[in-house]
């Protein structure tokens, strides 16, 4: 039962890291990346639909994304959704596909994005710490209820802390990699 607490904490921390990685993937680093468009929803017959379900996204050149809709009648809707996003990119609609040229990042914009990475990393660490707190509370409750001894509780709390430290280091490592990718362009 006590090992379940640690396994659950590990699993939830892995999920927190996965969410952080997905958010990092959506940050523009001056090169074309299909995951940049993952969060965009297109108003498709009144229903907000993920862009990735309505089209294929390819990368014909290093700084160009090409969006090919499955239904050509949705081109304008897709173009408007991309414009309305806060990505700072401008789509070019040629009647059959939408091309998005990813502009070079200015030094100032690179700094803003690096700060955004830092904020996302902090959000990820908070999620990990919340998982840690829940695990610690569960262990305290188990000790209080007599399910585990005080020594077992301390030992398990150390294990939870180690898992937390590892997850935090992983988030820091991912954030550092992304920051370097952005600042070195």
From Swiss-Prot:
HAMAP family recorded for this chain?
RRF
Name its cellular compartments: Cytoplasm
Alphabetical list of Pfam families matching this protein:
RRF
Q: What is the lineage of its organism?
A: Bacteria, Bacillati, Bacillota, Bacilli, Lactobacillales
**Matching InterPro entries, A to Z?**
Ribosome_recyc_fac, Ribosome_recyc_fac_dom, RRF_sf
Q: What does this protein do?
A: Responsible for the release of ribosomes from messenger RNA at the termination of protein biosynthesis. May increase the efficiency of translation by recycling ribosomes from one round of translation to another.
Q: Which keywords label this protein?
A: Cytoplasm, Protein biosynthesis
Q: Output the Gene Ontology terms for molecular function.
A: ribosomal large subunit binding
Which source organism?
Lactobacillus johnsonii (strain CNCM I-12250 / La1 / NCC 533)
Q: Name one GO biological process term.
A: translational termination
Kindly indicate whether the keyword Ribonucleoprotein belongs to this entry.
Answer: no
Q: Give positions of region: Disordered.
A: 140-166
Which cysteines share a disulfide bond? Answer: none
Gene for this protein?
Answer: frr
Task: Supply the name of the protein.
Answer: Ribosome-recycling factor
Task: Name the source's superkingdom.
Answer: Bacteria
Query: Which is one Gene Ontology cellular component term of this protein?
Result: cytoplasm
Family note: Belongs to the RRF family.
């Amino acid at each position: 039962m006590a090992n379940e607490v640690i396994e659950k904490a590990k699993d939830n921390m892995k999920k927190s890291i996965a969410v952080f990685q997905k958010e990092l993937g959506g940050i523009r680093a001056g090169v074309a990346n299909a995951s940049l468009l993952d969060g965009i929803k297109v108003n498709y017959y009144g229903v907000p639909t993920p862009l990735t379900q309505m089209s294929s996204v390819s990368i014909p050149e290093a700084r160009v994304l090409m969006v090919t809709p499955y239904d050509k009648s949705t081109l304008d809707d897709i173009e408007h959704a991309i414009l309305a996003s806060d990505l700072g990119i401008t789509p070019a609609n040629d009647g059959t596909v939408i091309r998005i040229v990813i502009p070079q990042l200015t030094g100032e914009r690179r700094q803003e994005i690096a700060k955004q990475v830092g904020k996302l990393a902090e959000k990820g660490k908070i999620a990990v710490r919340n998982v840690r707190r829940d695990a610690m509370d569960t262990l305290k409750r188990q000790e209080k209820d007599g399910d585990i001894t005080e020594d077992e509780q301390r030992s398990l709390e150390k294990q939870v802390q180690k898992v937390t430290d590892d997850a935090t280091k992983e988030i820091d490592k991912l954030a550092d990699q992304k920051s370097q990718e952005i600042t070195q362009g």
